[in-house]
Amino acid sequence: QTCALPILTVDHLHIVGDIYDRGPGPHIIMDKMMTYHSIDVQWGNHDVLWMGAAAGQMGCIANAIRICARYGNLDILEDGYGINLLPLATFAINTYGDDPCTCFQLKGSDSYSASEREMNQKMHKAISIIQFKAEGQIIKRHPEFGLEKRNLLHHIDFERGVLEMGGKEYKMLDMNFPTVDPKDPYAFTPEEADIMERLERAFMNCEKLQQHMKFLLAKGSLYKVYNNNLLY
């Protein structure tokens, strides 16, 4: 009888996303949701992002990792889903060892030690540059998306340290981009390509992540009309 009380109180549960956003523990929420007797989900943009990442889309993978890094939630990937971030961490240390990465500081988390924070900032910068490249490659392959204005790396004057756009110049706050080739700024280095191939396999082969995303797909939609109410 005790177990039946929540069912009698809440006959059907609507979850209006995002579930995956800046906060900790979305995998814990998903585990709980999957046990509920009657539920539907209206996806948020971050939920769609993670579904894309689970499908192996590299731009989505890099973006999901970047958000986790920025808000101090890399444990979602490592502990929650068992995704190995060591190759990315090693690459970040080797590439930005002497760079304080002050433009890539963490937000919303005070639980890290100084060394952990420094490591996360380097990983944040590394995956951010990878994301810019991955998205640039996608936009180039699909001009029909009309997203060319989102590509900025080719607007940087690396000799003068400015970004030229719309007839104006903007002083860059950070010019340490050793992995960006000014002649081909959206190309991965061999190390970046290897990291992304590993991460692609890790996301696509993570059983728990795949279960969670299949549940979102089965129970979710962009919007839902319920009792004459629009949920989105």
Task: Go through the PLM ranges and name each one.
Residues Q1-Y232:
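Feature recognizes metal-dependent phosphohydrolase scaffolds
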